């Protein structure tokens, strides 16, 4: 049986820009970074609060993928936060634009969206 989600893999267009975004802006911690010469590709393992959650990959000339929320495939990646207003201020101060706060009609919880450097929709959802 499944125990949970182990990690999410993301292929980025600009490795340096995405690495800075996920570490400096979102605060994920680097677990391991390797360059795979045979693929001319970086693989960056990232954790959040000590839990390994994201693999960030670079590949030479990756094809673009539609990233608007209604495209097939991954719709968005959501992170839980304690205080959405505080997190929005932090993101905005680091140059990240966020959408207006919305209220989930089913749970009454607050959430908003923003995007990573490749346009992947990201969400913060208040606990």
Residue spans for each PLM region:
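Vicinal oxygen chelate
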Residues: 1, 34, 45, 88-127
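N-terminal beta-strand motif that seeds the catalytic metal site of vicinal oxygen chelate
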Residues: 1-16, 74-77
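Exposed loop/turn and edge beta-strand positions of beta-sandwich/beta-sheet ligand-binding modules
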Residues: 4, 40-42, 73, 108
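Core segments of cupin and vicinal oxygen chelate
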Residues: 11-52
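Short amphipathic alpha-helices within nucleic acid-binding modules
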Residues: 21, 85-90
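A short, acidic/glycine-rich surface segment
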Residues: 31-32, 39-41, 61-67, 100
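Short, charged/polar surface micro-motifs in flexible loops or helix N-caps
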Residues: 49-53, 61-62, 84-85
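Mid-chain, well-packed structural core segment of small domains
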Residues: 70, 77-85
């Amino acid at each position: 049986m499944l125990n949970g989600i182990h990690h999410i893999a993301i292929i980025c267009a600009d490795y340096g820009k995405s690495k800075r975004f996920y570490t400096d802006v979102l605060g994920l911690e680097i677990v391991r970074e390797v360059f795979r010469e045979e693929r001319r590709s970086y693989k960056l393992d990232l954790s959040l609060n000590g839990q390994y959650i994201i693999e960030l990959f670079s590949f030479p000339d990756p094809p673009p993928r539609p990233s608007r929320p209604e495209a097939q495939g991954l719709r968005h990646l959501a992170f839980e936060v304690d205080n959405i207003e505080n997190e929005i201020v932090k993101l905005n101060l680091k140059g990240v634009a966020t959408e207006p706060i919305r209220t989930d009609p089913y749970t009454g919880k607050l959430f908003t969206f923003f995007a990573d450097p490749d346009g992947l929709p990201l969400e913060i959802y208040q606990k």
